[in-house]
């Protein structure tokens, strides 16, 4: 939870807040099926916590019903503040063997004091209680639901990374099992697309991982994941390594108003391709505007919102992605 959320602002990054209409969402899912779209996963989160949506379980069920065989898994990213037992039951009921569910809990703290400092409110005990309930009920019901607990290393919480690892690896080691794939994710802090402070944040991350000997691999019944690479191709101390950003190919975002965004890092929504209430996904995603932006990157031109961004570094732009964009550009006469 960042300041725009806990302070109740009307807008986040110049985008008016709101809930995705269930009827519109259903039409969008139908459109994805009609366009024969397939995804590795679908994340229910962008510029807000999905647990705020009153119909979250319904959205999960609709996606599972319509995208079965077209998506590897569904993913919900949440702080768990608004997920008491009755709402956790709705999430548990949405998990299915053919469309597994991953719930990512963003915690970033081990003590109440640090949680309040990082998150903006004193809610750690409530959050832990909600998560423990989910873990316990998952075991009782044998639900195909995996869990990831995240810790974003930053000034003010880095001293708690070791305790965080110990607490949750012990709990999941006891309440988890081989039928699930649970993870503890230690993430680097992202500073404005690689803006001033990013390199310092990366150094703090690396120092913290070394200090507590946190390494990728199995620990008890949980998989520990770390970020080995910088989050951005360029940042305040690294320049000249910029290449075509993979976000333009593999991170489409459907905003709550139905607009299709081209990149998950475009927080101000400058790369809107149009509304999925009026157009098909492929029509927009493979259209002139999207293809032109990809070709700009391939040629080394980073304009508009991309000029001030360091370029996503946690995915890779492959040769096949470049080739597909070039072929599409030729077909469109660009």
Where are these regions (language model features)?
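Conserved beta-strand->loop/alpha-helix structural units within folded catalytic cores of enzymes
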Residues: 1, 40-45, 50-53, 149-150, ...
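Local cysteine-cluster metal-coordination motifs and their immediate loop/turn environment
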Residues: 1-6, 262-265, 303-314
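Conserved Radical SAM active-site core
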Residues: 11-75, 81-97
């Amino acid at each position: 939870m960042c300041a725009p959320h806990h302070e109740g602002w009307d807008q986040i990054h110049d985008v008016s807040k709101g809930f995705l209409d269930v009827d519109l969402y259903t039409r969008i899912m139908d459109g994805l099926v009609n366009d024969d779209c397939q995804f590795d996963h679908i994340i229910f989160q962008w510029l807000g916590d999905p647990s705020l949506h009153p119909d979250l379980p319904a959205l999960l069920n609709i996606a599972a019903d319509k995208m079965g065989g077209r998506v590897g898994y569904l993913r919900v990213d949440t702080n768990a503040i608004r997920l008491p037992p009755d709402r956790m039951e709705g999430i548990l009921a949405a998990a299915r063997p053919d469309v597994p569910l991953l719930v990512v809990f963003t915690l970033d703290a081990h003590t109440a004091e640090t949680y309040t400092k990082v998150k903006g409110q004193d809610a750690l005990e409530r959050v832990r209680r909600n998560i423990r309930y989910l873990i316990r009920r998952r075991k009782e019901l044998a639900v195909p639901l995996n869990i990831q607990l995240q810790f974003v290393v930053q000034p003010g919480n880095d001293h708690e990374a070791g305790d965080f690892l110990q607490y949750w690896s012990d709990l999941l080691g006891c309440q988890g099992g081989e039928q699930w794939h649970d993870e503890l994710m230690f993430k680097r802090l992202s500073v404005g697309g690689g803006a001033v402070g990013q390199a310092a944040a990366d150094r703090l991350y690396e120092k913290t991982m070394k200090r507590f000997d946190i390494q990728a691999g199995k620990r008890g019944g949980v998989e520990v994941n770390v970020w080995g690479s910088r989050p951005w191709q360029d940042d305040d101390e690294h320049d000249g390594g910029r290449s075509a950003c993979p976000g333009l190919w593999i991170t489409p975002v459907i905003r709550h108003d139905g607009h299709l965004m081209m990149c998950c890092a475009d927080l101000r929504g400058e790369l809107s391709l149009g509304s999925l209430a009026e157009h098909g996904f492929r029509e927009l995603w493979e259209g002139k505007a999207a293809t032109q932006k990809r070709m700009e990157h391939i040629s080394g031109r980073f304009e508009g919102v991309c000029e001030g961004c360091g370029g996503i570094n946690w995915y890779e732009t492959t040769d096949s992605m470049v080739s597909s964009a070039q072929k599409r550009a030729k077909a469109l006469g660009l």
